[in-house]
Amino acid sequence: MVRQAQEVHMVPPGIFREYDIRGVYGRDLTPEVAGRVARAFAAYLRRKAPDDRPLPVVVGHDNRASSAELHRAVVEALVDSGCAVVDVGLVTTPVFYFARVHLGVDGGVMVTASHNPPEYNGFKLAHGFGTLYGEDIQEVRRLAETGVTVRGEGSVRTADVIPAYRVALRDRVKLGPRRLRVVVDCGNGTASVVAPQVLRDLGVEVVELYCDSDPTFPHHHPDPVDPKNLQDLIRTVRVERADVGLGFDGDGDRIGVVDDQGRIVWGDELMILFWREILPKYPGAQAIVEVKCSQALVDEIRRLGGRPFFYKTGHSLIKAKMKEIGAVFTGEMSGHMFFADEYYGFDDAVYAAARLLRILSHTDRPLSALLADVPRYYATPEVRVPCPDDRKFAVVEALVRQFKERYEVVDVDGARVLFGDGWGLVRASNTQPVLVVRAEGTTPEALRRIQKVLEEALARFPEVGPVDWGAEVGASR
């Protein structure tokens, strides 16, 4: 039964982002707010349901200090709303996705803030094939604010799905004859409960680095897109003479890679390796590439016979687009890798690691040699520049207009400004109060010139913080 509350419930509107819900625990997110969001999500699911049977919903959480309490509030609210809850407990986000497929459950709530700082938390809401984003997220917000709820006698049962997940990956990914030595850095995040175990199941020798679950993240933040978080992994790979180093983010859906020489393999380079394995099986396949990627990736996809096209960044957006066009694989610079080839299409860093190890296990060549023929452009890392949430999209819209007066611009997601010898990007993050900035040039001089163009454009906006390009600027890719 659907009930319209008479009062308006105060739910912070800023927690509803483009493709998930995030906020500071204790300020934006409390158990009470979690309950309201969960009740609104149950009402959303009821509207989508074909009949009045109990709504099955999988609920999981990451290892953040506040996650277990928010998890309990979500489960309680869903049961009160007539949902048949399957509580999978402490899991990575990909294991949560797997649980929905494995158990045949449409609905899902994952309590996680991914790579945000420790004081944050949030929710990923799932229905059908993918996770909610855009207008669907906003519909849940409106339901929460207006107090629309459903009532019923729900239920809850627990399920340990990690053993089934381990079996699934072991059966799907068979390594070749080469014995691999791998350093695994979980950053004390949730991947600690599954990544080392899965890789050992595959027959890999694992050297563990920060693979104890600890929500304070005492050694470094579990965000492998930031080079400073990979420094211990780089050192350990060199000391251990490992074949590869693998880093995972806080909820296990993003991967960072370090080659045998201790060099960071950026997300677009990693995608080149995967496309070289995948595209020969799908001649002429469409290939989604995000606006942050290197021109080297675009050129390599074309060389392999694929059809690249630029699209927006964001895991929910990507998964929906993949389903729409029947894409077999794509990825993001941030380390999200989406395999529909031989897998389910969702982003799973541990599965991506297994696929990389399969490639390495079938060759005697080191990872550094496999990428030696990729054009060596000069690029910055992804740089996050502070900008208030309520201004970041307006700033980007203004920049798009300004850049178009002088340059060719790809504006599908921010402004990818095209120069004859490189490109520069400014886009608004959908999950943090920052602008994401990146640049690439065919020479160090071209890169520096493009960086200066971006710096000068951003400096016109007083609400935008300074651009700190970091130590990696000018490093050859």
Give the residues covered by each predicted segment.
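An N-terminal, well-structured beta->alpha segment
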Residues: V2-E76, D80-S81, T158-L180
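N-terminal small/polar loop signature for handling phosphorylated ligands or for N-terminal nucleophile
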Residues: R47, P56-Y120, Q197-V258
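Active-site nucleophile and cofactor-binding loops and adjacent substrate-binding regions
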Residues: V85-P94, I264-G267, V289-E290, Y311-K312
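Glycine-rich phosphate-binding loop
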Residues: D106-Y120, V237-D259, I264, P308-F310, ...
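Gly/Ser/Thr-enriched, mixed-charge loops and adjacent short helices
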Residues: N121-E240
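Phosphate-binding and adjacent anionic-ligand microenvironments
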Residues: Y282-R477
